[in-house]
UniProtKB/Swiss-Prot annotation:
Coiled coil: none
Organism whose genome encodes this protein: Streptococcus gordonii (strain Challis / ATCC 35105 / BCRC 15272 / CH1 / DL1 / V288)
Entry protein name: GTPase Der
Gene3D superfamilies per the UniProt record, alphabetical: 3.30.300.20, P-loop containing nucleotide triphosphate hydrolases
Assembly information from the UniProt record: Associates with the 50S ribosomal subunit.
Length: 436
């Protein structure tokens, strides 16, 4: 069972994301003084008075025909449906607007606890203005200045008072994974296809998913996953909007939070130079990796198409030789059912521990096949090896002189270890260290 859920809703530019970030304690939602900059539901976990809960930020709702508005309304309705408590944010500076009344009518139908937060009450003189908001018929208004942190404690007190009694601890066996890739490779459509729900705004306009969005789901075997959809990354020279700049930073954070990363390629466009750069971020972070070629249904194929693609990927992503490749279609759901098992297998590989005795047998067998190198008449001696970490599996090899361990021989030892043990989808690190 998930944690209790709080949805933050309201019209555009009333400070929902600022309040969300104040409660979450970090800058998760993109906040700018531009209407409509938060378009999707954004999730975070918060706690207050020893109660832990999830909070959802939503795009601004308005009764107008603005771009994306129907999708934003639909997303907000899903968020309200998921929520145990709803925080309705209005602006004390502007008073009640037609859009506020439109949102209030939506909230009447939910029959859920509503906390009315009157934001932008930045000084004591403005407190008298909040009484007008009783006219919305949603109970006592709470004066708040989310920018300055004034009144947020009262809102949190009210949230906790209305939470359901059950509180469930997080699952320590949860596997976290993210989808990374350039804009418009189909990451959001993949999420929607996997979940069977319009979880994020999926649009053919590149870059329509701006934030990293967490979604929890369980497979048929009871394994829980947290899926993080990241904003598409773009070359620095092509990032013009501040929001895009924030999104690249957030994508890096999403990779950092992940156990496994799905590197999504677009079959229609082929492999781009920047795809390799993006994948390099995950590789350097030591994450498990699956290379996902999306939009496979759009290609005209023959008996060699898949093999040709695999060969090209192996050539272009030489540093990802350990990463499995899967060809999928978010539209037709082709092969998507295989992804959870692949992610689980990679997670197991990341957490594999090899007993030192078994590891050293493999190392000695490797030396018998290919003796250690020499340099200026001095031979590399390997005394023993031991595993020192997981996620990724990391091994220290104790030697007589670190300088004698050539990169090529270290790669040879890595290949022998991979042959002996299952490390599919995860990098492994080998470190040569002089024995003292």
């Amino acid at each position: 069972m998930a944690l209790p859920t709080i949805a933050i809703v309201g019209r555009p530019n009333v400070g929902k994301s600022t309040l969300f970030n104040r409660i979450a304690g970090e800058r998760i939602s993109i906040v700018e003084d531009v209407e409509g900059v938060t378009r999707d539901r954004i999730y975070a976990t918060a706690d207050w008075l020893n109660r832990k809960f999830s909070i959802i930020d939503t795009g601004g709702i308005d009764d107008v025909d603005a771009p994306f508005m129907e999708q934003i309304k639909h997303q907000a309705e899903i968020a309200m449906d998921e929520a145990d408590v709803i925080v309705f944010v209005v602006s004390g500076k502007e008073g009640i607007t037609d859009a506020d009344e439109y949102v209030a009518r939506m909230l009447y139908k939910t029959h859920k606890p509503i906390i009315l937060a009157v934001n932008k009450v930045d000084n004591p003189e403005m407190r008298n203005e909040i009484f007008d908001f009783y006219a919305l018929g949603l109970g006592d208004p709470f004066p708040v200045s989310s920018v300055h942190g004034i009144g947020t404690g009262d809102v949190l007190d009210a949230i906790v008072e209305n939470l359901p009694n059950e509180e469930v601890a997080e699952n320590p066996d949860m596997i976290k994974f993210s989808l990374i890739g350039r804009p418009n490779v189909g990451k959001s459509s993949l999420i929607n296809a996997i979940l069977g729900e319009e979880r994020v705004i999926a649009s053919p306009v590149a870059g329509t998913t701006r934030d990293a969005i967490d979604t929890v789901f369980t497979d048929s075997e009871g394994q829980e996953f947290t899926m993080i959809d990241t904003a598409g990354m773009r070359k620095s020279g092509k990032v013009y909007e501040n929001t895009e700049k924030y999104s690249v930073m957030r994508a890096m954070r999403a990779i950092d939070r992940s156990d496994v990363v799905l590197m999504v390629l677009n079959a229609e466009e082929g492999i781009r130079e920047y795809d390799k750069r993006i994948a390099g971020f995950a590789h350097e972070a030591g994450k498990g990796i699956v290379i996902v070629v999306n939009k496979w249904d759009t290609l005209e194929k023959d008996n060699h198409t898949m093999k040709d693609w695999e060969a090209d990927i192996r050539d272009q992503f030489q540093y990802l030789s350990y990463a499995p490749i899967i060809f999928v279609s978010a539209l037709t759901k082709q092969r998507l059912h295989k992804l959870p098992d692949m992610i689980k297998q990679i997670s197991q590989s990341q957490n594999t521990r090899i007993p030192s005795a078994v590891l050293n047998d493999v190392i000695m067998d490797a030396i018998a096949i290919n003796p250690t190198p020499t340099d200026k008449g001095k031979r590399l001696k390997i005394f023993y090896a031991t595993q020192v970490a997981t996620k990724p599996p990391t091994f220290v090899i104790f030697v007589n002189e670190e300088e004698l361990m050539h990169f090529s021989y270290l790669r040879f030892l890595e290949n022998q270890i991979r042959k002996a043990f299952v490390f599919e989808g995860t990098p492994i690190h080998l470190i040569a260290r002089k024995r003292k």
